[in-house]
């Protein structure tokens, strides 16, 4: 059985996390040549490349599996040894989360864990359709995703759903939709997407108004909070989680443009199995709060 030296795995992990050999060497307090030698040793052991040497480097499929193994071992070491050997160094937990969860329910869910437990969070923001890929690649140990099926050697639980409403300010609605939300009016109304892969707005319009993707003007803004600001100031219409804008809807700063029509995104919590004690705390906190504030039907 091939048993890697975990120093070599840590070198591989550092190259991926630090996005290059030079910064990985600085992180590990060794020379860049030593980093290269450790990775070459690991590649020789498995008889195949573990890194695609692009800028930044990325792991091969086998490299992803080894990184996932490393992160599981690190968490299980914490499970068995606790913090006896590194009592002054909080445990690092890398999680992949979608921006809308981060802007609404996720931080309140983790409050008790952050207060009571010696951990450092590394929250990697990614679209909920792609967070599971970060777990697959071994970049994180847990992910909030819309995927209901677990990866091999992983666990999954349902968190609940975010319901997205199509909203705008009253002034925007009066300007662009004086006769209601129609197909022709939507073609002129500026919208906003999180990035070029965010298709929620386009999917909503296609499903309900038969508008083809790319047919409406659309800003790109990488911030969930900015969606609310853009809508409130009357510059765009957009899809925003109801949970995020309850106050704005109640005081009429924003209006639901299509009452009864919405997009529902069911969210699931994925993590490696078996869970460490600390990850179990994170799981319990996320599930408990998620089941309280997210739609369960």
Curated annotation (Swiss-Prot):
Q: Name one GO molecular function term.
A: DNA binding
Organism domain of life: Bacteria
Name the InterPro entries for this protein: ArgP, ArgP_gammaproteobact, LTTR, LysR_subst-bd, Tscrpt_reg_HTH_LysR, WH-like_DNA-bd_sf, WH_DNA-bd_sf
The record, for SUPFAM superfamilies, names: Periplasmic binding protein-like II, Winged helix' DNA-binding domain
Keywords (A to Z) from UniProt = DNA-binding, Transcription, Transcription regulation
Give every HTH lysR-type domain span.
4-60
User: What Pfam families does the record tag this protein with?
Assistant: HTH_1, LysR_substrate
Q: Which CDD domains match?
A: PBP2_IciA_ArgP
Q: Which residues bind DNA?
A: 21-40
- Report the family membership: Belongs to the LysR transcriptional regulatory family.
Q: What does this protein do?
A: Controls the transcription of genes involved in arginine and lysine metabolism.
User: How the protein assembles, per its UniProt entry?
Assistant: Homodimer.
What is the recorded name of this protein? HTH-type transcriptional regulator ArgP
């Amino acid at each position: 059985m091939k048993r890697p030296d975990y120093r070599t795995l840590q070198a591989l992990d550092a190259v991926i996390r630090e996005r290059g050999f030079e910064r990985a060497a600085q992180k590990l307090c060794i020379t860049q040549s030593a980093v290269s030698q450790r990775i070459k040793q690991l590649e020789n052991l498995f008889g195949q490349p573990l890194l695609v040497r692009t800028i930044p480097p990325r792991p091969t499929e086998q490299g992803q599996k080894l990184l996932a193994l490393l992160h599981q071992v690190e968490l299980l070491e914490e499970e068995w040894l606790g913090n006896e050997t590194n009592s002054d160094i909080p445990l690092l937990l890398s999680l992949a989360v979608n921006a809308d969860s981060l802007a609404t329910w996720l931080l309140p869910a983790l409050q008790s864990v952050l207060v009571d437990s010696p951990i450092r969070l590394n929250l990697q923001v990614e679209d909920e359709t792609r967070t599971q890929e970060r777990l697959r690649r071994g970049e994180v140990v847990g992910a909030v995703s819309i995927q209901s099926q677990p990866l091999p050697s992983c666990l999954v639980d349902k968190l609940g759903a975010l319901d997205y409403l199509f909203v705008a300010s009253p002034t925007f609605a009066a300007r662009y939709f004086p006769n209601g939300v129609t197909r022709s009016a939507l073609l002129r109304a500026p919208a906003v997407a999180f990035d070029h892969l965010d298709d929620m707005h386009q999917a909503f319009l296609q499903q309900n108004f038969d508008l083809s993707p790319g047919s409406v003007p659309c800003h790109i803004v990488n911030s969930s909070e900015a969606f609310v600001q853009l809508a409130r100031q009357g510059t765009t219409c957009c899809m925003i989680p109801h949970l995020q804008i309850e106050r704005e809807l109640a005081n009429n700063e924003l209006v639901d443009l299509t009452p009864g029509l919405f997009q529902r995104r069911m969210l699931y919590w994925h993590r490696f199995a078996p869970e460490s004690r600390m990850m179990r705390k994170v799981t319990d906190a996320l599930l408990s709060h998620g089941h309280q504030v997210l739609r369960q039907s």
